[in-house]
């Protein structure tokens, strides 16, 4: 994909900046729009959002090279809607599109007039602009967006999503989500009683026509070749946007532990680098935080969570489905090593699912029917969310000191609290011990999925997932593979679709969950320490 001074020819990338007439600059769109794609009323913005204006100025003005500036491309009506004292917009090359030969401007400084979008992009691909202009941003209005939004030259769309209902008379075309995927979405903001958020969408495929030619089904298994992104490099994004991808929360924590972590011993004898007291916050409203810098075992995430929800403590249930993540802690050798010599192989004891569904019940073995025994915390969580959403005691705990000695492994992710506001469900989970290489990518996805499932059965929208970690550690034998992972650039997170017909937490099966747009880097092997 073209980068900072990129040009395209006949819809294809070209690394050259030679001023050939058939070459055009690529560009990014910056726009604020309502949920029905309204962008204006009576020739003006129908909202007053100072933070949005600040964002617009920052993204269109910032450059990575001090000697360069950005270009902003707009139609004549958009130009005229800018107050006279602010025209032209400072620090940027203002490119105004008009077919009117009599169009007059107050000053020629930093202003260029072009007759069409294509002629403007050709001009910006030619000298001197090919060398002096770093990025090109298209800023409106409606007709310009209709020409520019979903065509191959558009690399990204920086959209301020207005969630409040506001009357408009000017509209932009909808974003084509078959070719654009969300890169980053801010947490919602409220300003002047208007709720909104900032979202950047990046192009991942050449065109809707080419995607349609592949017969892409959005519910296909994510391993299908038809789900792979055509665009592999997203370095065209402004740095201020690129670094907001939420995967960097994880990557920066890993990098920090490798660089600054305390050397510690551990029960496995492997040795770790460790930091204490960390937090990551993920936005579940549009994306699903399944890491992309390595392939995460999605089927394993789903099946393990369903296993927890069922209350099962039998590792063989997962083994029969090809899920072997608990094999090490369920083996005969391991159970004997922790003093559970009378425990049947595969019986993990009163671990997560048992505590979620039968807290306080007396544990015998994995075969016993515990129906009606103990306290069903998960059902209690769902009932409180439905009946008393402002309750501050919506808690799910896997930590039961009485049962710890009976568990093959005490719970690492041990405590979750749920919170309802604005029709959204958020979850904060505390994890006492966090294996950053193998465990945390799984844990992030698992509790994000649990939050989405509970929101779904309670007719709420997923909100935030806040991951609080006590001992965040990297095993010594994971340092090298994690350093390999740190060299991978994140890709857009996928989105999650849940079967709308399922409304009972106990009714879900793995086929009820579909990922759309998961195209990670390759799997990176790391050895489990037990």
From Swiss-Prot:
Cross-referenced Pfam families: DHFR_1, Thymidylat_synt
Transmembrane segments: none
Annotated protein name in UniProt: Bifunctional dihydrofolate reductase-thymidylate synthase
Similarity-based family: In the N-terminal section; belongs to the dihydrofolate reductase family. In the C-terminal section; belongs to the thymidylate synthase family.
PROSITE patterns for the chain: DHFR_1 (PS00075), DHFR_2 (PS51330), THYMIDYLATE_SYNTHASE (PS00091)
InterPro entries: DHFR-like_dom_sf, DHFR-TS, DHFR_CS, DHFR_dom, Thymidate_synth/dCMP_Mease, Thymidate_synth/dCMP_Mease_dom, Thymidate_synth/dCMP_Mease_sf, Thymidylate_synthase
Reactions accelerated catalytically: (6S)-5,6,7,8-tetrahydrofolate + NADP(+) = 7,8-dihydrofolate + NADPH + H(+); dUMP + (6R)-5,10-methylene-5,6,7,8-tetrahydrofolate = 7,8-dihydrofolate + dTMP
Positions of the DHFR domain: 26-203
Presence of the UniProt keyword Lyase in the record: no
Chain residues that bind dUMP: 267, 413, 431-435, 443, 473-475
EC number: 1.5.1.3, 2.1.1.45
Region (Thymidylate synthase): 206-530
Region (Disordered): 1-20
Organism: Glycine max
Binding locations of substrate: 30, 52, 139, 160
The protein's role, per its UniProt record: Bifunctional enzyme. Involved in de novo dTMP biosynthesis. Key enzyme in folate metabolism. Can play two different roles depending on the source of dihydrofolate: de novo synthesis of tetrahydrofolate or recycling of the dihydrofolate released as one of the end products of the TS catalyzed reaction. Catalyzes an essential reaction for de novo glycine and purine synthesis, DNA precursor synthesis, and for the conversion of dUMP to dTMP.
Pathway: Cofactor biosynthesis; tetrahydrofolate biosynthesis; 5,6,7,8-tetrahydrofolate from 7,8-dihydrofolate: step 1/1
Keywords: Methyltransferase, Multifunctional enzyme, NADP, Nucleotide biosynthesis, One-carbon metabolism, Oxidoreductase, Transferase
Binding locations of NADP(+): 32, 38-44, 76-78, 97-100, 140-147
Covalent S-S links between cysteines: none
Annotated Gene Ontology cellular component terms: cytosol; mitochondrion
GO molecular function, one term: dihydrofolate reductase activity
A biological process from GO: methylation
């Amino acid at each position: 994909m073209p980068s900072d001074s990129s040009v395209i020819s006949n819809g294809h990338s070209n690394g050259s900046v030679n001023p050939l007439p058939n070459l055009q600059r690529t560009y990014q769109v910056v726009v604020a729009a309502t949920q029905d794609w309204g962008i204006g009323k009576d020739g003006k913005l129908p909202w007053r959002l100072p933070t949005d204006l600040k964002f617009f100025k920052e993204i269109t003005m910032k450059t990575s090279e001090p000697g360069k500036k950005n270009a902003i491309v707009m139609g004549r009506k958009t130009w005229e809607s800018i107050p006279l004292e602010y025209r032209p917009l400072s620090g940027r090359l203002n490119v105004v599109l008009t077919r009117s030969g009599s169009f007059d401007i107050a000053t020629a400084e930093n202003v260029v007039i072009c007759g069409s979008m294509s002629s403007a992009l050709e001009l910006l691909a030619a000298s001197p602009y090919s060398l002096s202009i770093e990025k090109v941003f298209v800023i409106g209005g409606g007709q310009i967006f209709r020409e520019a939004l979903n065509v191959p030259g558009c690399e990204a769309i920086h959209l301020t999503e207005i969630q409040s209902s506001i009357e408009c008379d000017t509209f932009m075309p909808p974003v084509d989500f078959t070719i654009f995927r969300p890169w980053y979405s801010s947490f919602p903001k409220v300003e002047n009683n208007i709720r909104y958020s900032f979202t950047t969408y990046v192009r991942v495929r050449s065109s809707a026509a080419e995607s349609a030619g592949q017969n892409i089904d959005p519910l296909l298994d994510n391993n299908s070749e038809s789900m792979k992104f055509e665009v592999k490099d997203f370095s065209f994004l402004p740095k201020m946007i690129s670094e907001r991808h939420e995967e960097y929360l994880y990557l920066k924590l890993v990098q920090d532990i490798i660089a600054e972590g305390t050397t510690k011993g551990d029960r496995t004898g492997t040795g770790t680098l460790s930091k204490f007291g960390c937090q990551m916050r993920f936005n579940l409203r549009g994306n699903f935080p399944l890491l992309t810098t390595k392939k995460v075992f999605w089927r394993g995430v789903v099946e393990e969570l369903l296993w927890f929800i069922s209350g099962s403590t039998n590792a063989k249930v997962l083994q029969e489905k090809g899920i072997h993540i608990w094999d090490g802690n369920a083996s005969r050798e391991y159970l004997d090593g922790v003093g559970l010599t009378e425990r049947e192989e595969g019986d993990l004891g009163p671990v997560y699912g048992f505590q979620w569904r039968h807290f306080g019940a007396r544990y015998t073995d994995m075969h016993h029917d515990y129906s009606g025994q103990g306290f069903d915390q998960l059902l209690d969580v769902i009932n409180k969310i439905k009946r008393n959403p402002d309750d501050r005691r919506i808690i799910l705990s896997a930590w039961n000191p009485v049962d710890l000695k009976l568990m093959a492994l005490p719970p690492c992710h041990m405590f979750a609290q749920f919170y309802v506001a604005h029709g959204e469900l958020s979850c904060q989970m505390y994890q006492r011990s966090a294996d950053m290489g193998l465990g945390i990518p799984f844990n992030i996805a698992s509790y994000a999925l649990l939050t989405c499932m509970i929101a779904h059965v309670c007719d709420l929208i997923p909100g935030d997932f806040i991951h609080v970690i006590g001992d965040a550690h990297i095993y010594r034998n994971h340092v090298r593979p994690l350093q390999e992972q740190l060299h991978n650039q994140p890709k857009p997170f996928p989105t999650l679709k849940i079967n709308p017909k399922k409304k009972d937490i106990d009714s879900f099966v793995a086929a009820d969950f579909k990922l759309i747009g998961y195209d990670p880097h390759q799997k990176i092997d790391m050895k489990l320490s037990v």
